Amino acid sequence: MSKKITEQDIIDSVASACQFISFYHPEDFVKGMVEAYENEKSDAAKNAIGQILINSKMCAMGHRPLCQDTGSVNIFVKVGLKANLDITKNLEDLLNEGVAKGYTDPDNTLRYSVVADPAGKRTNTKNNTPAVIHVSVDNSDKLDITVAAKGGGSENKSKFTVLNPSDSIYDWVMSNVKDMGAGWCPPGILGIGIGGNPEKAMLLAKESLMGHVDIHELKARGAQTPLEELRLKLYEDINKLGIGAQGLGGLTTVLDVKIL
């Protein structure tokens, strides 16, 4: 039988994850930024990327937030049917307790960006809850929890559309990226969800961002599917737009394009 998972295990794990992602960039993102820095020809863009990398190192060393916007929390949970869960509380409540604990940590208090009664008084909840939680079930003996913090700059640039069969996904994406400006703090990763109904497509887009930065591996081996061809074409052509780091021009607007 698998190890017993308690309520406190869940709370502490989520709290720790919220703190961890507040001051550590993923390694694949840092590698992508270093490569972008090394390849950049524009002095302004190179300086902007350099500042992001310096900030990343300082935050990692000092355990301080990477940005003043510490995001709204997105949690993806896979509940194994064989998992040994020793809980009596609602799982969603436990996850939110973990978020509250992580964001109110006195050693590194994070910004609270969530309000109650959003159509009315808009009162800050003072602990960044509730999180946006997605739960699925599999046949494992594990409880898999992925925690992400999504900043408002990029989240507010999210787009959705219903295309006609004759419409071009490529054209729609390119048109929207051109108009987004730099409010989403490029260089970043573009996540695209295709198919299903409206909420499914948006969820796929968010889930795609959980993948590793691997566009250069894809370029090296070559596209093997239409989606991979679309990824490469969008990656190349978006970076030709000249938006660049923090909107200052240059060669790198996106580090990767993800599609599910």
Predicted features along the sequence, with ranges:
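Non-transmembrane, aqueous-exposed alpha-helical and coiled segments at domain scale
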Residues: 1-260
